[in-house]
């Protein structure tokens, strides 16, 4: 049995992975919308956070406005994602689905990778 080395190096920012979907090809707009709809369909509260790429691996990200409690329109969530990206064009932007029942994050994904 051989062990495959993943070519990620601290010296190479492009090789760093963040969140589950970063190991897959970049998501299309339709795929991101499907993930937003998944969050909404489960009754989770969508929220958007952003951070400078150099601070992305610290614990604190800036919250974009408040979580969208009770939001049922995926397009409204995506409009806020776009507004966050326009206001913070060089930052990573992630979408979170807060699960009230489990009192935790049910989903957490990077929807825009910042410039490194």
From Swiss-Prot:
It comes from the Bacteria. RuBisCO catalyzes two reactions: the carboxylation of D-ribulose 1,5-bisphosphate, the primary event in carbon dioxide fixation, as well as the oxidative fragmentation of the pentose substrate. Both reactions occur simultaneously and in competition at the same active site. Although the small subunit is not catalytic it is essential for maximal activity. One of its GO terms (biological process) is reductive pentose-phosphate cycle. It is found in: Cytoplasm. Induction: Induced by growth in high levels of dissolved inorganic carbon and low NH(3) levels (at protein level). It holds the Pfam family RuBisCO_small. Keywords: Calvin cycle, Carbon dioxide fixation, Cytoplasm. HAMAP family: RuBisCO_S_bact. GO terms for molecular function: ribulose-bisphosphate carboxylase activity. GO terms for cellular component: cytoplasm. The basic functional RuBisCO is composed of a large chain homodimer in a 'head-to-tail' conformation. In form I RuBisCO this homodimer is arranged in a barrel-like tetramer with the small subunits forming a tetrameric 'cap' on each end of the 'barrel'. This is Ribulose bisphosphate carboxylase small subunit 1.
């Amino acid at each position: 049995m051989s062990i495959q080395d993943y070519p990620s190096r601290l010296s190479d920012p492009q090789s760093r992975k963040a969140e589950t979907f970063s190991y897959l090809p970049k998501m299309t707009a339709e795929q991101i919308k499907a993930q937003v709809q998944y969050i909404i369909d489960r009754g989770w509260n969508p929220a958007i956070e952003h951070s400078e790429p150099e601070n992305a691996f610290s614990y604190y990200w800036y919250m974009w406005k408040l979580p969208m409690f009770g939001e049922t329109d995926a397009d409204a969530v995506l409009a806020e994602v776009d507004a966050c990206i326009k206001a913070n064009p060089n930052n990573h932007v992630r979408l979170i689905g807060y699960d009230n029942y489990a009192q935790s994050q049910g989903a957490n994904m990077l929807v825009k990778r910042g410039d490194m």
